[in-house]
Amino acid sequence: MFCVIYRSPQRDQTYLYVEKKDDFSRVPEALLKGFGKPKLAMILPLDGSKKLVGADIKKVKTALREEGFYLQLPPPLESLLKIHLSDANKV
């Protein structure tokens, strides 16, 4: 199984995985509208020979089979206040 990965031009670090190049037929229209015009990032085999950054390969494969797509969102931002308070407590 292969997947085609597209990056969002509107949302930083947001990626859309589909099974076939330029086939967004199973992706909800509202998601595509918010995602923007998908920009091809890469095509990867999902056989475990390559590691996915920021996504679990099993979850991606399951989502592709069941829903027809997988949406990878950016990691949550760390709270600067939390970091500051943590550093202040170390002093």
Swiss-Prot record:
Protein name: YcgL domain-containing protein ETA_15380
Entries under InterPro entries matching the protein: YcgL-like_sf, YcgL_dom
Domain YcgL span(s) in chain numbering: 1-85
Xref: Pfam families: YcgL
Intrachain disulfide bonds: none
HAMAP family linked to this entry: UPF0745 (MF_01866)
Natural source organism: Erwinia tasmaniensis (strain DSM 17950 / CFBP 7177 / CIP 109463 / NCPPB 4357 / Et1/99)
SUPFAM superfamilies (UniProt xref): YcgL-like
Coiled-coil parts of chain: none
